[in-house]
Amino acid sequence: MYLKNYNLKSKTAIVTGAGKGLGRACAIALAEAGANLIIISRTKKDLDEVSKKIKKLRSKCKSYVCDITNYNEIKEIINKQSKIDILINNAGNNRPAHFTKVKTKDMEYMVKINTIATFNLAHLCALKMIKSKNRKKIGGSIVNMSSQMGHVGGPIRSVYNMNKF
């Protein structure tokens, strides 16, 4: 239990990229601390597995299959929520290729998911958080996942590195 010293009961957390890896681990840790979860991923099967684990921890869980690069989809998901206390902006993508061989469509997709979608989610959640009653008293948290790769160059990760700085 990573967040054992935290009491997140009555808090609602959104985690993107929640189906696998760090997103999955974050969602489960937040549930262990008592938060209710809204999990987002592109893969229903992964979401179902994580949702089941969260519910075993006695936390409420809503799951949404969504491509976060679709602004209208994420806006609809955010607008459906009665409140948001925490955003873990974790979803991301890497399509390794040597800089001289990066395809324009791959570069544009990585920028869209790693930068634009991250901004859009943070912006939409911040607007929702600001509207909450007692916001000054209870606060809110937005965590945008980054990577050490943003500080290290590499011949096959140039676009990813640029997006993760």
Where are these regions (language model features)?
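Substrate-binding pocket helix/loop in short-chain dehydrogenase/reductase
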Residues: 98-99, 103-108
